[in-house]
């Protein structure tokens, strides 16, 4: 499929070249192959790549969760070698790369890692900010505010790579111990990463079915699956969050974590390498072992009981995002500098 996309873009580029178009600079995400042959059309153009991730057979994420290990471990390195061929085909043509986090940049081979600048896409901290009087309408419960005990959990798709199974398995105890809590879960039913569920099923429903019998009807009524939300509504969700839970394999760091921190949320997160770039334990959030659902719930409940700690962690989290990830003050100027350096280098 990558070659098919590359060929289609090559033909479109040739048509543009024949009309006199000649770019000085090409910026591309190489992951789907569109940029494979562009410098064959425009040999003098500089090519900069968005380096999201280089897949390695034994690190960082593929063998992380034994419950969802590869069914064919002997051939997994072969599959990944083929998957990475696209990266290697780009390395020779590219002049430089940019990665949003050190963790992602460090997955790349050293020969190309030396050409990668770490610069995040950036968070608009003027939009993602604390808002004391915010209200969020949730079907079945009316308006929720910061006066309510709201626990939030966000995935693009509800799946094991982002710890959905760990969170769901911890729900029965959380609902039992926190009788006033509302749990707001954001995410779709598909798969973004990792193994697909059995035919005709979704990870969302599989883990609902696993825990549903442990949760009384009245408690289950306090769990709200919101699907995907428009961005403004999503920010309001983060702004009312009393504790935000973020779980992920050692993988691409979710923008939603940084947005939650920018909104001043108190975060409980998995203690994995990409998360540790932004969360220092008990400074900008609290870290727990990814697989330890009991510790996760203890950390959540402890923060729900400690308003002073929540305020301190949320204040520190927002300060870190503003200092290192602010779109307009930090990241966009660095991106412009990177483009200028690429163009003139």
PLM region descriptions:
Residues 1, 44-85, 126, 130-131, ...:
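Acceptor-binding helix/loop patch of EC 2.4 sugar-transfer enzymes
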Residues 56, 68-148:
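Donor nucleotide-sugar binding/catalytic pocket of nucleotide-sugar-dependent glycosyltransferases
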Residues 266-269, 279:
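Short hydrophobic beta-strand element within catalytic cores of glycosyltransferases
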Residues 281-282, 286-293, 302-308:
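Conserved acidic donor-binding segment of nucleotide-sugar-dependent glycosyltransferases
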Residues 249:
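Aromatic "clamp/platform" in nucleotide-sugar-dependent glycosyltransferases that forms part
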Residues 3-4, 308-344:
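A charged, aromatic-enriched C-terminal amphipathic alpha-helix characteristic of glycosyltransferases
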Residues 191, 195-228:
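Nucleotide-activated donor-binding/catalytic signature segment of Leloir-type glycosyltransferases, i.e.
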Residues 137-162, 168-173, 183-184:
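Conserved donor-binding/catalytic core segment of Leloir-type glycosyltransferases
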């Amino acid at each position: 499929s990558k070659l098919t996309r590359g060929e289609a873009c090559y033909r479109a580029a040739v048509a543009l070249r024949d009309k006199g178009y000649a770019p000085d600079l090409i910026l591309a995400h190489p992951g789907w192959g569109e940029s494979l042959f562009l410098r064959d059309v425009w040999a003098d153009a500089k090519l900069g790549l968005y380096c999201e991730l280089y897949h390695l057979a034994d690190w960082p994420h593929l063998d992380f969760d034994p419950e969802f290990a590869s069914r064919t471990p002997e051939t997994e390195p072969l599959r990944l070698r083929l998957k990475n061929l696209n990266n290697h085909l780009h390395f020779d043509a590219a002049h430089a790369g940019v990665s949003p986090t050190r963790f992602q940049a460090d997955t790349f081979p050293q020969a190309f890692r030396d050409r990668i600048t770490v610069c995040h896409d950036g968070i608009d901290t003027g939009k993602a900010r604390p808002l004391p009087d915010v209200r969020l309408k949730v079907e079945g419960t009316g308006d929720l505010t910061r006066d309510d005990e709201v626990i939030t959990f966000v995935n693009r798709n509800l799946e094991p790579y982002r710890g959905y199974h760990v969170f769901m398995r911890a729900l029965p105890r959380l609902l039992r111990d926190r009788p006033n809590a509302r749990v707001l879960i954001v995410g779709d039913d598909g798969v973004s990463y990792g193994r697909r569920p059995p035919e005709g099923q979704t990870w969302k429903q599989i883990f609902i079915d696993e825990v549903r019998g442990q949760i009384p009807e009245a408690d289950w009524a306090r769990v709200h699956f919101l699907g995907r939300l428009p961005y403004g509504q999503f920010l309001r969700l983060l702004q009312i969050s009393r504790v935000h839970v973020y779980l992920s394999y050692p993988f691409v760091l979710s923008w939603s974590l940084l947005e939650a921190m920018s909104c001043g949320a108190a975060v409980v997160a998995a203690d994995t390498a990409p998360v540790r770039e932004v969360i220092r334990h008990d400074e900008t959030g609290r870290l727990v072992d990814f697989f330890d659902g009991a510790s996760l719930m203890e950390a959540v409940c402890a923060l729900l009981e400690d308003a002073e700690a929540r305020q301190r962690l949320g204040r520190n989290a927002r300060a870190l995002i503003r200092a290192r990830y602010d779109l307009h003050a930090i990241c966009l100027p660095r991106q412009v500098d990177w483009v200028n350096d690429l163009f003139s280098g």
